[in-house]
């Protein structure tokens, strides 16, 4: 068994990464792609490796010279690499390919080293490594028959998104027998490039062969998480994350702040959503309108306020719509002056926007609780202009009842202090204590209250970025609207506001389910030795580690969960307010997901 790599291309889409070297010399986490590949070949017991090279070939040859004495490395030059494609590179290697059973691979891959060993040891003579199609994949896809053989290769023009469940993406790693290469593949390839062009892809020939004989090339199935194809800098970033480990892996995930659809196998307990909403009917209605929405401009702020006012039962003059609550937090901070009292630990977006120099930190006790009196006293002592209350608080889950918020608003009003009330998680409180200040009667009576609510978090639609700010101060609403762009939310977000009322009863039911599952989840977590769960009225739980769990630590636990179980949690070790212990925050997801996390925690702490 030998190996052959096609590495003549220029890798133009990688920009500066391939300015001075070929694509296979691009580093991923400190090691080049070619090093990963050769080490995988050596691990599989392969002794001979041939590379078809072209662009920056001398740089590559010098890099590999004497580096791997365990394996024979030969080179074939493709000096017309800039005007040909990989079909010609493979044709140049026809004698090598026909001389022995061969592992064929491309130069822009990073992959689990076990894959090469698996196909080398497989009894199947001719194999294509494939993964069940996922949305992030691009390139050649196949359809398999019942015997897991490739019966058809789907061209881009025939690709149908409605059939993706039946598609398998080629990883661009193959095993060809000597007989297949010599008697079937190379004769077809030679004839094809003579008849058509040298600027084609070798998969085109495989498409013809699979059409004529749907059993000759078997599929070797691997998980999509075990490989990645690197065509551009965005791919490189994703590959670096996928193939990192420990603290580097965790930090890489945190730094993206989302976009986790690129990691479909990962279970996200870090970011906070509503697992029971929206219902399929709402999603399908939005899908039905997707073409029109994609091609249409959204309305301006007055129409958005009208739609949001309808949902929340307030006058449009009392509500502003933002591109997520984050835009509204930024806007209110820009329009504010003076000090703001912030109970901590808290959601960092607020102190980041108001500025540490204007933030008065109100320390909570060891149970992360505080009283109305604590807040009022701090506001008075520091001559604050504002108080921020996230209710339930993030990340503690601490909760003020409706009466407590009313008392707080009244006492602050008497001191000419405004209350910024963030209700992003209040809908998840137990039904008997659930309430909202987004009510025209309440905000008209308590004119010093400014309510902010993240629709993205509460309604399970973070991708469309929606939030609202509510106040009876109409001049403030006008200022907020002037402070944002005329089209600050997109057509998909506007359409969600337009149709939401039809699904309002489903939303209430979804919030009840979260409250119920939170109780069960909290109870099960509390049974794990070394895990203390704090009471919460939100869609997340604050936990403190003790005993043996504390020795692992919050950071160590987050690393173990991500590397070993593909589960992402929020490590709070670097967050202000958690200096005296090991704390994590866990989102409340559905029962199945929560049980998967509980199983992982029990294994780690056993």
Feature-to-residue mapping (PLM):
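N-terminal nucleotide-binding beta1-loop-alpha1 segment
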Residues: 1-19
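Conserved N-terminal catalytic core of the sugar/cofactor nucleotidyltransferase
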Residues: 2-5, 31-102
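Conserved core of the sugar-phosphate nucleotidyltransferase
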Residues: 112-196
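Active-site pre-lysine segment of PLP-dependent enzymes
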Residues: 118-122, 369-382, 395-419, 423-461
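PLP-dependent aminotransferase class I/II
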Residues: 166-170, 279, 300, 448-527, ...
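N-terminal "arm"/small-domain region of PLP-dependent enzymes with the aminotransferase-like
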Residues: 238-296, 382-383
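PLP-dependent aminotransferase-like
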Residues: 334-389
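Conserved PLP-binding catalytic core of the aspartate aminotransferase-like
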Residues: 515, 525-565, 588
């Amino acid at each position: 068994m030998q190996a052959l790599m096609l590495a003549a291309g220029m890798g133009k889409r990688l920009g500066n990464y391939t300015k001075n070297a070929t694509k296979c010399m691009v580093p991923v986490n400190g090691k080049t792609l070619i090093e990963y590949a050769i080490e995988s070949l050596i691990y599989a017991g392969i002794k001979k490796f041939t590379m078809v090279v072209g662009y920056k070939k001398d740089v590559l040859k010098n890099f590999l010279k004497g580096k791997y004495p365990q394996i024979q490395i030969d080179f074939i030059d493709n000096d017309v690499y800039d005007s040909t494609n990989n079909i010609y590179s493979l044709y140049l290697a026809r004698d090598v390919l026909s001389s022995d059973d061969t592992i064929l691979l491309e130069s822009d891959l990073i992959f689990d080293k076990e894959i090469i060993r698996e196909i080398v040891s497989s009894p199947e003579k001719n194999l294509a490594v494939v993964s069940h199609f996922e949305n992030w994949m691009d390139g050649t896809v196949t359809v398999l028959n019942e015997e897991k053989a490739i019966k058809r290769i789907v061209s881009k023009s025939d690709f149908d998104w409605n059939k993706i469940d039946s598609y398998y993406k080629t990883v661009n790693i193959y095993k060809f027998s000597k007989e297949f290469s010599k008697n079937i593949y190379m004769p077809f390839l030679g004839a094809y490039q003579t008849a058509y062009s040298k600027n084609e892809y070798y998969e085109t020939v495989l498409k013809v062969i699979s059409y004529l004989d749907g059993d000759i090339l078997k599929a070797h199935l691997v998980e999509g998480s075990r490989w990645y194809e690197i065509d551009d800098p965005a791919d490189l970033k994703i590959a670096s994350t996928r193939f990192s480990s420990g603290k580097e892996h965790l930090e890489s995930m945190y730094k993206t702040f989302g976009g986790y659809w690129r990691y479909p196998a990962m279970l996200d307990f870090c970011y906070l959503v509503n697992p029971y909403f929206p219902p399929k009917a709402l999603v399908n209605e939005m899908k039905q309108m997707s073409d029109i929405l994609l091609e249409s401009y959204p309305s301006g702020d007055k129409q958005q306020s009208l739609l949001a006012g309808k949902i929340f039962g307030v006058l449009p003059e009392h509500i502003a719509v933002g591109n997520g609550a984050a835009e509204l937090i930024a806007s209110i901070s820009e329009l504010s002056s003076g000090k703001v009292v912030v109970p901590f630990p808290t959601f960092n977006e607020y102190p980041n926007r108001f500025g540490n120099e204007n933030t008065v930190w109100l320390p909570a006790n060891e149970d992360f609780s505080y009283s109305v009196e604590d807040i009022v006293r701090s506001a008075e002592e520091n001559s604050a202009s504002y108080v921020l209350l996230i209710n339930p608080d993030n990340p503690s889950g601490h909760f003020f009842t409706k009466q407590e918020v009313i008392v707080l608003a009244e006492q602050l009003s008497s001191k000419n202090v405004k209350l910024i009330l963030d209700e992003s998680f209040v809908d998840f409180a137990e039904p008997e204590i659930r309430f909202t200040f987004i009510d025209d009667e309440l905000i008209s009576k308590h004119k010093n209250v400014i309510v902010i609510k993240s629709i993205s978090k509460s309604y399970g639609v973070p991708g469309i970025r929606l939030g609202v700010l509510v106040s009876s101060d109409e001049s403030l609403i006008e200022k907020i609207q002037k402070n944002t762009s005329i089209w600050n939310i997109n057509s998909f977000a506007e359409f969600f506001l337009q149709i939401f009322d039809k699904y309002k009863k489903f939303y209430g039911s979804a919030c009840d389910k979260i409250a119920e599952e939170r109780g069960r989840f909290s109870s099960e977590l509390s049974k794990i030795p070394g895990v203390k769960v704090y009471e919460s009225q939100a869609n997340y739980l604050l936990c403190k580690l003790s005993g043996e769990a504390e020795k692992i630590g919050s950071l160590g636990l987050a690393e173990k969960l991500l590397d070993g179980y593909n589960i992402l949690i929020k490590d709070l070790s670097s967050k202000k307010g958690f200096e005296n212990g090991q704390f994590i925050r866990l989102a409340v997801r559905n029962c199945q997901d929560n049980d998967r996390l509980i199983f992982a925690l029990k294994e780690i702490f056993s």
